[in-house]
Amino acid sequence: MAFPFTSIVGQEEMKLSLILNIIDPRIGGVLVMGHRGTGKSTTVRALAEVLPLIDRVKGDIYNRTVEQYIEMESGVKGAPVLKASDVKTEKIPVPVVDLPLGATEDRVCGTIDIEKALTSGVKAFEPGLLAQANRGFLYIDEVNLLDDHLVDVLLDVAASGKNVVEREGISIRHPARFVLVGSGNPEEGELRPQLLDRFGLHARIITINDVAKRVEIVKLRREYDENPEAFLKKVVRQQQKLQKEIVAAQKLLPKVSMDDSVLTDIARLCMALGIDGHRGELTITRTAHAFAALQGDTNVTMEHVRKIAGLCLRHRLRKDPLETVDAGEKIDRELAKVLGEAEVAA
C-alpha cells in the first residue's frame, strides 16, 4: 500500500503534472527536479493507486487489452483467428515500473534469443521493463545520471507508444504506452537541452519551508506508518473523489476545443520567449486541453494556458548565464505582454 495521494502535503506542481499526463499521455511525461527526500517517488506510486484497475488479457506480460492482443496474435503466421470471447481477462492495478540506474538497453527493451530463433524458427523474445510498463508509469530516479543513449531510447518509445527490438535481421515489436516520469537533483548534473526538450512537462520540487506544513507532513507520515489500513479508511472519500475527477476528465477530453485566437496567443508567447522548434506550442495545447477537462470546461481559454505555461516551457527556455530573472517570472511577464497585446487588438 502506497501513502495516499490526497494526503501528500504541498508539491502541487508535481501532482498536477502527473494528473495531466494521466488524462492525456500524449503530453509526453514529466521531469521532476528537486532535492532528495521531497516525496518524488512516493507521489508517483500514490497516484497509481488512486487510478481505477485496468483490464488486461490474463497473464499477459505486455498488459495488453483484448483488442491489442487479438491484433498482434492474429497477425502471427499460422495462428488461429481469435475472437474477443476466446480471450480471458483480469483486472490489475496500474503498473509502476522502476528503471534502475545501471540498467542495460537489453534489460530495458528486451532481448531476442538468436540461437533459439535460428534453430527452432521461433521468435524467442525475453520482454524488458518497457513491456511491464505498458499502460502504466515508467519511473526513473536520477534520470540526469542515466546514459544519454538510454534516455534517447526511452523518449522515442514513450513518444511512439511502441517498442521495436531488432537483432540480426529479426524484429519484434510490442505496445509500450506509458507515462514517463524522470526525477533528479539538479545539483548532481543537468540533462542535455535536447533531452530536456523531449519531456512534456517540467515540475520543480522544493523543500517546504513552512513550519506548520513540515509538522503536518511528519504527523501524517507517523499516523500512516503506525496503522496504514486505518489511515487509508480516513481518506478513502478524497481518494475516490480524485479518481472520479480524473476519469471524468478523460471522458471529457475529446469534447474540449480551442479557438484559433487562443492558439495564436500560444504561438506568440513561444516566439516571444525564443522557444526553439514547435514542441512548446504542441505541449501547451495538449496540456491546456487536459487542464480544461480536469476543470470540467469544454473550451480552452488563456486562463487555462496561464496555469500550465510554466510547466510546459520553463525547461525549453534558452539559458543566459547573465540573466537573473527566474524562468517562471520570465514566462509570466511575456504571457502578460501577449494578453495585453491581445486585449489591445480586440
Curated annotation (Swiss-Prot):
Question: In the UniProt record, does the keyword Membrane occur?
Answer: no
Asked if the record carries the keyword Repeat, the reply is no
Organism name: Chlorobaculum parvum (strain DSM 263 / NCIMB 8327) (Chlorobium vibrioforme subsp. thiosulfatophilum)
What exactly does this protein do? Involved in bacteriochlorophyll biosynthesis; introduces a magnesium ion into protoporphyrin IX to yield Mg-protoporphyrin IX.
Q: What class of enzyme is it?
A: ligase
* SMART domains listed in its UniProt record: AAA (SM00382)
Q: Report which reactions are catalysed by this protein.
A: protoporphyrin IX + Mg(2+) + ATP + H2O = Mg-protoporphyrin IX + ADP + phosphate + 3 H(+)
Q: Name one GO biological process term.
A: bacteriochlorophyll biosynthetic process
Can you say what this protein is called?
Answer: Magnesium-chelatase 38 kDa subunit
Provide any one GO MF term from the record: ATP binding
Which keywords does this chain's UniProt record carry?
ATP-binding, Bacteriochlorophyll biosynthesis, Chlorophyll biosynthesis, Ligase, Nucleotide-binding, Photosynthesis
Family, according to the entry, reads as follows: Belongs to the Mg-chelatase subunits D/I family.
The EC number on file is 6.6.1.1
Residues annotated as binding ATP? G34, H35, R36, G37, T38, G39, K40, S41
- Pathways per UniProt: Porphyrin-containing compound metabolism; bacteriochlorophyll biosynthesis
